[in-house]
Amino acid sequence: MIYLWVGVAGFIGAAMRYGVGAAFYNADAFFPFSTLSANLIGSFLLAWFTIGLVQHRQLPESLKTAIGTGLIGSFTTFSTLSVETVMLFERGSTAAGVLYVLLSISGGLFTANLGYALGGRKKTE
């Protein structure tokens, strides 16, 4: 049954990823901003989910796996980042390729840290 939940959540995450890609797509952009946006949002969400929902609330393992691996895992796109970076270098856009990788890694760490910090806050009651 877990495969079904991961698959359903993965379908939703992939559809969300497509929506972000369509919303942020710009053919004239210096580098692929749509992929960067999806990966930064996904880094934040996975960290927030991991600390905020998993550690502070009782959730079934199947739901944790479906959301973390299925939904958020299909939303983020490391393979697309890799291919787009190679394409930037191949067409001679070295500065854009380097900037894209640096922003992806540093931005991902920053948004993951932010999600972790916000998810770890205890609610005042």
Stretches with model-predicted labels:
Residues M1-E125:
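Membrane-interface helix-loop junctions in multi-pass transporters/channels
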